[in-house]
Amino acid sequence: MERNQIAAQLYTIREYLKTPSDIAASLKRVRDIGYQAVQISGMGPIGPAELKKMTDDLGLEICNTHIDYKRMEEDLAGVIEEHEIYGCRYIGIGGLPGEYRNADGYHRFAVAASKIAAALAAEGFIFIYHNHSFELERYGDRTGLQILYEDSDPTVFMAEIDVHWIQRGGADPAAWIRS
């Protein structure tokens, strides 16, 4: 994917991605609009090879994904295999699991996710974390998002800054991007 290329985040049309035929029709519409890349998330059941064929047939690149963190914990080899099929190096999670949403939890997640991110990096993949506004809640002198970024391994734990959620949380998106 080109550095400044815009991709369609498929989670925004998840209501139209329930079945393989829905997915095929929606991907065609996304391509017809002019997108050349998509982020996979919020889709109904479809095998990775079938999805890859659909995107290839339309000339769409799968540039990144959002998957359930529990899947990374329980089946990292399967996650890697799926992303090999996609030809996609960026593997993200769409949100922090609820059990980590406190000061200690943010730290524990940063440490645990860094280990998973390191394992992904060893296989040539990049772990990305997608924020929401709740990570801007303060815990002492730091926000949850600061805890995540400061307590994780910055060589393998990468940010996917969602400017909407940063703004909604009352912070400056440009400042977060620069940091």
Residues covered by each model-derived region:
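Glycine/small-residue-rich loop that forms an oxyanion/phosphate-binding "nest" at active or ligand-binding sites
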Residues: 74-113
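N-terminal pre-domain/capping segments
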Residues: 1-89
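Alpha-helix-loop-beta-strand connector modules within alpha/beta enzyme cores
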Residues: 49-67, 113-120, 146-154
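Structural detector of well-ordered beta-strand residues that form the stable sheet scaffold
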Residues: 7, 63, 92, 128, ...
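Charged helix-capping and loop-helix junction motifs
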Residues: 21-25, 76-77, 105-114, 141-146, ...
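Active-site beta-loop-alpha junctions enriched in small/polar residues
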Residues: 9-13, 41-43, 66-70, 96-98, ...
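Loop/helix-junction capping segments adjacent to catalytic residues or to phosphate/diphosphate-binding pockets
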Residues: 17, 45, 73, 100-103, ...
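Acidic/histidine-rich catalytic cores of soluble enzymes
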Residues: 118-179
